[in-house]
Amino acid sequence: MQFKPALESATLLKRYKRFLADIELDSGEMRTIHCANTGSMTGCATPGNKVWYSTSDNPKRKYPNSWELSETAQGHRICINTARANQLAVEAIENDVISELVGYDQLQTEVKYGNENSRIDILLSASDKPKCYIEVKSVTLLDEESPSGQGYFPDAVTTRGQKHLRELTEMAQTGSRAILLFTVLHSGIEKVSAAHHIDAKYSTLLKQAQDAGVEVLCYKAELSNTEVKLISAIEFIN
């Protein structure tokens, strides 16, 4: 996914009200930008860090700038815009980047499924294969004390994520292919695990899902102010 024009940089002053952040441009101008990430953003929103933002040409937007990337004091880049995860996953599947998902004829998004009134992020189908249900999650939480780049999901208790695991488990049990796809959007993360210390129920449900046949894939992104794209698989350890 390319950013046209390229993202512009600024210094983060503060994030507040979940959806907003104040930044300072190199010129000294203060500006309020939109933050699409409503999560805890642990390690991703430290005041003083460098951030990159995009600009919308929609005249109806109250805040035309959107926060896209952060850079930590250690030099790691993070895509904090959670809306990008699904876009990156679709792009990677269509470009055959994810080898495990090659060979399907049709890709649909936001299709209703399951018994808990959910919408699957991506549904793949082909005449010679079972349907493939893919739930996409964004991983941005790095254990900063880990020398091996240990990343975790989730970064806060997620009842919605728990529901998605139950739905995927049901799909696997009924003969469909079910996949949890972690898009790793932090340049410092080299492997991913369920965050049992943050959401023990999610971790337990994920183990149950794997036992039922749900596949877990982790693909890491390359991040710059001109482009973000998934490039390679990394290890999942549960």
UniProtKB/Swiss-Prot annotation:
Highest taxon of source: Bacteria
GO molecular function, one term: DNA binding
SS bond list: none
Stretch forming the signal peptide: none
InterPro entries given in the database record: SfsA, SfsA_C, SfsA_N
CDD domains (UniProt xref): SfsA-like_bacterial
Family: Belongs to the SfsA family.
NCBIfam families: sfsA
Name of the protein described by the UniProt record: Sugar fermentation stimulation protein homolog
